[in-house]
Amino acid sequence: MNLYNIKHPEEQVTFSQAVRQGLGRDQGLFFPEVIPQLNNINELLELPLVERSQKILGALIDGELPQATLDAMVKNAFTFPAPLEKVEENIYALELFHGPTLAFKDFGGRFMAQALAAVRGDGKITILTATSGDTGAAVAHAFYGLENINVVILYPKGKISPLQEKLFCTLGGNIRTVAINADFDACQALVKQAFDDVELRQAIGLNSANSINISRLLAQVCYYFEAVAQLPKEKRDNVVVSVPSGNFGNLTAGLIAKTLGLPIKRFVASTNANDTVPRYLKSGNWDPKTTVATLSNAMDVSRPNNWPRVEELFKRNGWDLTDLGSGMLSDSETEDTLKAMQSKGYLCEPHGAIAYQVLKDQLKASETGIFLCTAHPAKFKESVERILGIQLPLPETLDKHNQLPLLSDEMDNDFAQLRAYLLKS
């Protein structure tokens, strides 16, 4: 598999190099030179998740890893289901929260850990990543205890849910967590500064586990196939998928699935008040505003890292960017939507609720809608209980971590401090 740097197309790397490096020159994102057209989609849709994913990832990575190695990586990573649940006539929820940290990022985080272990070679690696909520837990649990890999996770202090924080800030060992006195965009900027520091990168073997790492995106492609595979065959012709969007990695993965030949008619990018992309699609002006805190904190992102990949896919496929649906919900609208979903017998959380409502508003009578549920409602226990007036029992994994003390360090939004911290980690 060959990839190129979107900013500097002359910079070309293999899959193994892209996994190890994370980012290219000038913080450029790596992107596959070729995305093959799969001609056996119907056959693939008949297979179970793991076997189908082994074939999809085998086609994408294209022989760079032995198929037996890749098969083992997928089998070890995808140890949990992604069920499709009917919410109402023609609208389905793809539940991506049945993994060990109860969020969709378990798919990408666990596959990336497997990939890095397979291609890293000798020497220590430091994973530096920023999280607005779920990435931190998925990465921490995927890499916890792996030899010669240290993990440092930055997150905005006070801007993620207490349960999210407990899931990744209580492990210790090779997992270090840092609460930054700033918002998530500032955390991402610190990560990018670290990657621009060539001396630092070489000194600590720097890598990233954010969705900028191609291995995470490729893993996420697989659950779009799983969604369509669970639909009745008569409903597979006019499928619309609504994706709750923050950094836009999830949407990028869906667009790669469509490029491979998965029959998805169109996508809808659903955001909260941090609506840089919906405004851009309407006006043509890229105008990120100051990030605001919302109920759906994992989408509190004003400068989405993966947007260049989205534009690259539209350009390469000859698609019109205006065909990408979009919409946003305020917090009060999100609360109303959660109540409406509860009345239909479906318990959700803010991110999934936004994806549901934006989909419902834009779905045509002839279409079948799927919205992505990216986290278990209990991960947002306080807000969901307040809004719906219910008591949510904690799943066992959350309850266990909720009893443990936080092990985080705290730091100002200061790259010099972070650099010194990384060098002594």
UniProtKB/Swiss-Prot annotation:
Pathway: Amino-acid biosynthesis; L-threonine biosynthesis; L-threonine from L-aspartate: step 5/5. One of its GO terms (biological process) is threonine biosynthetic process. Keywords: Amino-acid biosynthesis, Lyase, Pyridoxal phosphate, Threonine biosynthesis. PROSITE patterns: DEHYDRATASE_SER_THR (PS00165). GO terms for molecular function: pyridoxal phosphate binding; threonine synthase activity. It catalyses: O-phospho-L-homoserine + H2O = L-threonine + phosphate. The keyword Amino-acid biosynthesis applies. Gene3D superfamilies: 3.40.50.1100, Threonine synthase, N-terminal domain (3.90.1380.10). Its cofactor is pyridoxal 5'-phosphate. Its EC number is 4.2.3.1. InterPro entries: Ser/Thr_deHydtase_PyrdxlP-BS, Thr_synth_N, Thr_synth_N_sf, Thr_synthase-like, Threonine_Synthase, TrpB-like_PALP, TrpB-like_PALP_sf. Pfam families: PALP (PF00291), Thr_synth_N (PF14821). It comes from the Bacteria. The modification N6-(pyridoxal phosphate)lysine is found at K105. The keyword Amino-acid biosynthesis applies. Belongs to the threonine synthase family. Catalyzes the gamma-elimination of phosphate from L-phosphohomoserine and the beta-addition of water to produce L-threonine. This is Threonine synthase. It comes from Haemophilus influenzae (strain ATCC 51907 / DSM 11121 / KW20 / Rd). The gene is thrC.
